[in-house]
Amino acid sequence: MIEFDNLTYLHGKPQGTGLLKANPEDFVVVEDLGFEPDGEGEHILVRILKNGCNTRFVADALAKFLKIHAREVSFAGQKDKHAVTEQWLCARVPGKEMPDLSAFQLEGCQVLEYARHKRKLRLGALKGNAFTLVLREVSNRDDVEQRLIDICVKGVPNYFGAQRFGIGGSNLQGAQRWAQTNTPVRDRNKRSFWLSAARSALFNQIVAERLKKADVNQVVDGDALQLAGRGSWFVATTEELAELQRRVNDKELMITAALPGSGEWGTQREALAFEQAAVAAETELQALLVREKVEAARRAMLLYPQQLSWNWWDDVTVEIRFWLPAGSFATSVVRELINTTGDYAHIAE
């Protein structure tokens, strides 16, 4: 298995170094659900601003304030503790009376707004996230500037970030031990983290191998292509390659890579053979995913940050703004810009 730090770069390994998250204010995340509260219903959507506390901690505190069980408070995704983050929580509070959430007090957390909603907010039910990052102590401004320009055109690898694999890769190591011993894992959280890490690592490996090709975005026979911004995909045939290539070049279509698991991976012929060869050595992890009935899926190979802009405060400090769809990692963008010191694994997805 390729170590995360050794995954192939799309724009080559950065020439300079820099510091990500010198302080929480250097990493700002604003959640974008893609919809507004209904204004009625048995749930309450609460938009919070937090700094220095994780999402589960705030959700539990909100449940205690509302005098409801912790499981009645949900959220679309975990947000980093060591950052300034804005996100929505959802509390099930039936009845006509609206609680006064302006009285909710928690250090590092502020209620921005709240309203009734008809449906529970479920994990993953968001459109994306807007990021504002500050990179400090940048050693090579010219290199970072050119990389930002190139990313606007060519994007970045859509790798799962190091945080998916746990501190020091602990989640992936857990999956590997599980795959080797076949011992039942009864802890639901461990099962989820380990299976997710296994599948994500295999995806990253397939993408890393594909990026070694001279023309990364070249459509091949049997590729599974995804409509940009959509989850559906279809298989490319030899007769259509020229037209499909044009649409990929225009960013109408995205080449996908496999999230291995049980069932067919989605690619065929040449593309399928390539993906299978890329992870051929990882038989134990593949067998684990099949055994645990984790269904195979597809994910775009490249990621194009939207609304990308940047502003140099001075020669060694740059503020970068962009929007990413749900499931994508800001650290995968930063990885193509600078070599950073420290471990990304503490940054929540």
From Swiss-Prot:
Responsible for synthesis of pseudouridine from uracil-13 in transfer RNAs. Residues 180-187 are annotated as: RNA binding. One of its GO terms (cellular component) is cytosol. It catalyses: uridine(13) in tRNA = pseudouridine(13) in tRNA. It comes from the Bacteria. The lineage of its organism: Bacteria, Pseudomonadati, Pseudomonadota, Gammaproteobacteria, Enterobacterales. This is tRNA pseudouridine synthase D. It holds the Pfam family TruD. Gene3D superfamilies: TruD, catalytic domain (3.30.2350.20), TruD, insertion domain (3.30.2340.10). Changing residue 31 to D: 3-fold decrease in activity. Residues 155-303 form the TRUD domain. The keyword Disulfide bond does not apply. One of its GO terms (molecular function) is pseudouridine synthase activity. PANTHER family: TRNA PSEUDOURIDINE SYNTHASE D. Keywords: Isomerase, tRNA processing. It is an enzyme of class 5 (isomerase). NCBIfam families: PRK00984.1-4, tRNA_TruD_broad. Monomer.
